Structures are given as structure tokens and as C-alpha cells.
Amino acid sequence: MPIGDRQNPSVEKKKNLFRLCPFWQRRSTTSSSSTQNPNQNYRSRHGNRNTDISAVSKPPLTMSSVARSLLPARRRLRLDPSSYLYFPYEPGKQVRSAIKLKNTSKSHTAFKFQTTAPKSCYMRPPGGVLAPGESVFATVFKFVEHPENNEKQPLNQKSKVKFKIMSLKVKPGVEYVPELFDEQKDQVAVEQVLRVIFIDADRPSAALEKLKRQLDEAEAAVEARKKPPPETGPRVVGEGLVIDEWKERREKYLARQQVESVDSLS
């Protein structure tokens, strides 16, 4: 074999290795192209980056928004009593309790009662709408069942029955319907869950005196709502006779003018 046809073994190995690793070729080609067109590569890289940022950009979270998400919802109602409903313990009878609700927010607020014992309890009124600063007394009725096996019911202890009071911000002029709370579930706030406590009806106590006082106020509020509103229109006298004050004054004036004219003629 001629000497000119022979090749150096080390050179042949480098060629074979270069063929087996094609990414070296791509790398060299890329580096050469980037060297030839540096401005074009810079624009393409930075242009793509700006497009991606604008596509995924989101408004930054502020401390106030994070705090609002962590803090509980602000209450709209002030309750009295605030945690428990006191009932006189009289087995076999329907007893009453009372609670005062006041709208402490700056907007009209609807409220609604719910109970875990709807068969033996009901509220009057079951719900309503309060203007800012307005108050209402609600009366809660409950039937007290006889204890099983003639066991004596422990007094001044929490019962299993609970009442939940919910609130909802509404616009002025909106009338209360229970469906309001179903249509706007995301905006409903739970004001309080009240537990039932039975107290001795024959033993004087501060809780019993306060309960009697609130029941009297609730009854007075119900009677006041039953009275018709005061009349602001024309007064009605007899059967369909409407007396307008302006017409009455005008008739008196005309009568006085006629008397004066008669006196002048005489």
C-alpha cells in the first residue's frame, strides 16, 4: 500500500468522533450565526421575553388585600344577648325567648334565622331588612319536651339546639324574601351561632329578669307595628267628604269679602 494513501490514526479518530457528536456541529453553526448577526439575535431574544411577560403578568398582591383575605368578615349586626338564647324550663309547654338585633353597618342589611330544630322552634319575624342604625326585637318560640325516663333536665347548661343568624348587604328599597340568601350565597355572612340555655322559671335570676324585660319590649314593638301609619293626606269627615285646608281657608276668605261688600252697600 503506498505511503501517500495512509492516514494518521489520531486524525482518523478525531474525524470519527466529530461524526458521532453532531451537536458540536450545531453549536459551531449557532455560534457562527450569532457572531454574524448579533443585533438580530438580541432583538429576537428580548422581544420574545417581553411577549411572555405581558402574557403572564398579574397585578401584584398588596398587604391590604392579603390582610383582608386573612381577617374574618366584619359583622353587620349587634346582638343582645350575643351568644345564648335563654328559655324558661317548662316541660310540655311552649316557651319564649327574645333577642335584639341592631344594624351597625352603613348599608341596608337583611337578616335571617335558621335553627337545628325546625319542628319545635320558630322565630317571629324569621327575617327582615334593617336600615343603618335600625333595631328590631325578634321573639323565638320553642316547645319544651318532657325529659326521657323522667330525668331532670340540668338547668343553666347548653342545649343541643342552635340558632344561626345570617346577614346580607342589600340595596335600599329591597324587600325581604328568603330567596335573597340563596341567590347571593357568596355574600352571606354568619353573624353568630346561638346556643340554647334553659333557666329555672320559678327562681329569680338576672337572666330571667332580662328575659322578661326583653319579651315585654318585643311585644310592645309588635303592637306598634300593627298600628296604622299616621295620615298625611287630606282629612276625611263623614262619608266621602274631603276637607282641604287650602279650600277651607279660601272659602272663609270669600265669605268675609261678601260680608264686607254688603256692609259697604248699606
Curated annotation (Swiss-Prot):
Its job: May play a role in vesicle trafficking.
Region described as Disordered: spans on this chain: 28-57, 219-239
UniProt domain MSP: residue ranges: 76-199
Gene Ontology, cellular component aspect: endoplasmic reticulum membrane; plasma membrane; plastid
Gene this chain is encoded by: PVA41
Keyword annotations: Coiled coil, Phosphoprotein
Biased composition (Basic and acidic residues): 219-229
Family: Belongs to the VAMP-associated protein (VAP) (TC 9.B.17) family.
Expression induction: By treatment with mannitol.
Residues in coiled coil: 200-228
Phylogenetic lineage: Eukaryota, Viridiplantae, Streptophyta, Embryophyta, Tracheophyta
InterPro entries to which the protein is assigned, alphabetical: Ig-like_fold, MSP_dom, PapD-like_sf, VAP
Gene3D superfamilies: Immunoglobulins (2.60.40.10)
Single biological process term from Gene Ontology: response to osmotic stress
UniProt name for this protein: Vesicle-associated protein 4-1
Residues bearing the modification Phosphoserine: S264
